């Protein structure tokens, strides 16, 4: 049911074509998938972060593909130098989507943190992420500490399944669930 069409096309190591080639392939693929599977959910090709060159690429491409996907997709992988963004790029990605009139759910389908993982995930959710997929322990690059991994697993076990999240202070968020119950997290 879920189709992730292509991967990080702004990186030549994944896609050798031009922007126009990507747009044509993406839109055609999405159209064929929807024709063959009407209930399919198309996930946008993952944007490889929000570095200036990535933003420039997606600012020109998004208006031409926005009618051909259901879920916007951002990746956050730490570079070899360990550089990362505190909200897993979700704040900047949400602003970019808004700037080109794209109003779609945001998924982070490759999440690697380099700081406290729970704090990064909470900030990403507060900034609009609907779903975050951890790249796991076998991903290349810097590894999450055992303590961070334990904290992230505990966070997921305790707070998964929420329907909304809001900041109630600089270090507190409130999760709301389908049954109306609420949980507060201090981080």
Predicted regions and their residues:
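Active-site cleft segment of glycoside hydrolase catalytic domains centered on the general acid/base Glu
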Residues: 1-69, 75-95, 99, 115-122
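Secondary-structure transition/hinge residues
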Residues: 37, 101, 157-160
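Generic beta-sheet signal
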Residues: 45, 109, 134-135
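Short, structured coil segments at secondary-structure junctions
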Residues: 68, 102, 127-128
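Active-site neighborhood of phospho(di)ester-bond hydrolases with catalytic His/Asp-centered motifs
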Residues: 73, 107-110
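Aromatic- and carboxylate-lined catalytic core of secreted/periplasmic carbohydrate-active enzymes
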Residues: 113-187
């Amino acid at each position: 049911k879920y189709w992730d069409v292509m991967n990080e096309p702004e990186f030549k190591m994944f896609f050798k074509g031009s922007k126009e080639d990507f747009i044509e392939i993406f839109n055609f693929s999405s159209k064929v998938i929807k024709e063959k599977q009407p209930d399919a959910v198309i996930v946008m090709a993952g944007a490889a972060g929000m570095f200036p060159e990535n933003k420039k690429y997606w600012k020109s491409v998004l208006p031409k593909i926005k009618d051909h996907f259901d879920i916007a997709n951002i990746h956050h992988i730490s570079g070899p130098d360990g550089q990362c963004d505190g909200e897993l790029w979700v704040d900047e990605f949400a602003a970019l989507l808004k700037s080109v009139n794209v109003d779609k759910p945001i998924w982070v389908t490759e999440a690697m943190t380099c700081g406290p993982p729970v704090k990064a995930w909470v900030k990403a959710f507060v900034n609009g992420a609907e779903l975050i997929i951890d790249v796991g322990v076998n991903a290349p690059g810097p590894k999450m500490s055992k303590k961070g991994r334990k904290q992230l697993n505990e966070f997921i076990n305790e707070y998964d399944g929420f329907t909304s999240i809001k900041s109630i202070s600089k270090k507190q968020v409130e999760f709301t669930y389908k049954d109306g119950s609420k949980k507060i997290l201090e981080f």
